[in-house]
Every structure is written in C-alpha cells, then in structure tokens.
Regions:
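Non-catalytic terminal/accessory segments
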Residues: 1-216
Length: 216
C-alpha cells in the first residue's frame, strides 16, 4: 500500500464493518473468482463470504482443496468454523442471513432472533402508549426486515406475523389491567382478531409477501 507516496506493508486487516472492507475484499478475491470459474466450479460470493455449489461430495472436496491452496498462497486464513462441506438436501447451510436447505431458503435462527429482539425493545415499555404509537414504532423494523428477506419460504411470514400479533395482544391485555378494566373473558385472538391489527395499520409480512408474488 502507498501512504504519502511511501510504500508500507500493513500488519493487520481492515476493521470489520468498515465501509471500504467490501471493496478491498472484492479486489483481493477477484482472482479466486476467476480461478474457480476457470476450474468449472460454481461459487457465489459477497465480500469475503462465499459458498461453492457442487454436484457431488467428490466435487465439493476438490473445490475446497482449490480454495485452501489459493488462500494459503495469498496469505489468507479460512474461518475454521464456517469452512465445511455440507449436504444442502439434509443439513443445509447459512449464508448472508439466510438458511438454505432442500432448495428453499428462510431467515436463519440468528436473523429471526435479532428481529424479535428489536420488536421486544420497541414494545417493552408501553405504559401510556396507545396501540397506534406502538405499531408506528415497529412498522419500520418490519418493512426493513421484509425488504431483505422477502424471497424467503412463504410460511416464514405467517409464523412471524403470528408472533407479533401475540406480542401485541399481550400488551393490550396488560394495559387493560393497568387501566382497572374488569377481568377479561374469552380468548385474546377472538377479542383482538387479525383484522383488528390490520385496521390499526400493522404491517403484515404475509400480506406483503402475497403482494410481491402477485406483482407482474
């Protein structure tokens, strides 16, 4: 590298999350892309995360050997826990926030947990806040999450929608008790059906997914 026209050799890599890190990864790993393509392997890469897609265990082992040889010569170290051979028809694998398995994809567990943590953070202190305000706080989170995971396996969105509505019903029940309202009778999902939250503007992941599927 050059600094003030003087050459120097950095002893550490760029900080994780730095704006320039993906660019440097693309520049440095571009030869690996061409090598794998030239050898007939299919590889998908984003910055320094990549997966090789192979038709047999033998081909996968050969592809991994090529990658190991190249990275060693390039003075790079493969992540010991992330570097492995898997059968996507049985075990599946995580990549860029998704879990891929049997030709389908859905948010990996860590991505689901992160979304739920964000919703909990926005709905943890709701005293004095009406439902419209709570929904206004969580809708941007849901829209952003959907924007990235909208191509997930469809049942995923129904499951997450259900979890969010149960969370909101719990809040409504708690608020009624704090307001001194008499004991509630009947199931929460009957008292506050799905249409109730739709009427109050709650962003529906399932509804958004259906709209994407129907668009030309």
């Amino acid at each position: 590298m050059l600094e003030d026209t003087r050459e120097w050799v950095p002893e550490q890599g760029t900080p994780q999350g730095a704006v320039i890190s993906p660019l440097l990864s693309n520049i440095y790993l571009d030869p690996l892309d061409h090598l794998m393509t030239g050898r007939g392997f299919e590889m998908v890469r984003y910055a320094d995360d990549f997966v090789g897609l192979c038709r047999s265990p033998q081909e996968a082992a050969e592809a991994l050997a090529v990658v190991r040889d190249w990275t060693e010569k390039a003075s790079l170290i493969l992540h010991p826990e992330k570097t492995r051979l898997v059968d996507a028809r049985i075990e599946g694998f995580d990549f860029l926030g998704y879990h891929f398995e049997r030709g389908r994809r859905w948010p990996r567990k860590k991505s689901m947990d992160k979304l739920k943590d964000s919703i909990r953070a926005k709905t943890g202190r709701t005293v004095g806040k009406g439902l419209p305000m709570v929904i206004a706080h969580i809708n941007p989170i849901l829209r952003g999450w959907f924007g990235y995971f909208k191509h997930s396996y469809r049942p995923t969105f129904r499951i997450v929608d259900g979890w969010i509505r149960r969370r909101l019903r719990s809040i409504l029940r708690r608020q009624r008790k704090l307001d001194g309202i008499a004991k509630l009778h009947g199931a929460d999902h009957v008292r506050w059906p799905n249409a109730f939250f739709t009427k109050h503007g709650l962003f529906s992941l399932q509804g958004a997914r259906d709209a994407v599927s129907q668009s030309p």
